[in-house]
Swiss-Prot record:
Protein name: PqqA binding protein
GO MF entries: quinone binding
Gene name, Swiss-Prot/TrEMBL: pqqD
Organism in which the protein naturally occurs: Methylococcus capsulatus (strain ATCC 33009 / NCIMB 11132 / Bath)
InterPro entries recorded: PQQD, PqqD_bac, PqqD_sf
Subunit description: Monomer. Interacts with PqqE.
């Protein structure tokens, strides 16, 4: 599935992302288990709150980490998350 740069994104309502002290990292909890996230994935998914799209996520991360040219990597991660059902697009009517 191809991600549109201006489509708002949110974490799937079937999942919950939280800090897991035992693993010392963020995880996604789902009914059948848990997915451990690295720091980068967690930073990206935290911005999937229904208020941000690909463009604004990239902008915020570039400012936060004083980085540039990260759009292809962020897009790849978000498309993978979308295809795995971790996030969903919010369609504005």
């Amino acid at each position: 599935m191809s991600l549109q740069p201006d489509t708002l994104l949110e974490l799937s309502p079937l999942l919950r992302m939280q800090w897991e002290e035992a693993q010392q990292r963020y995880v996604i909890l789902y009914p059948e288990g848990m997915i451990e996230l690295n720091e980068t994935a967690a930073a990206i998914l935290e911005l999937c709150d229904g208020q941000h799209n690909l463009t604004s996520i990239v902008d915020k991360l570039e400012r936060k980490y004083d980085a540039s040219g990260i759009e292809p990597d962020v897009r790849e991660m978000l498309e993978s998350a979308l295809n795995n059902g971790w996030i969903r697009e919010i369609i504005a009517y």
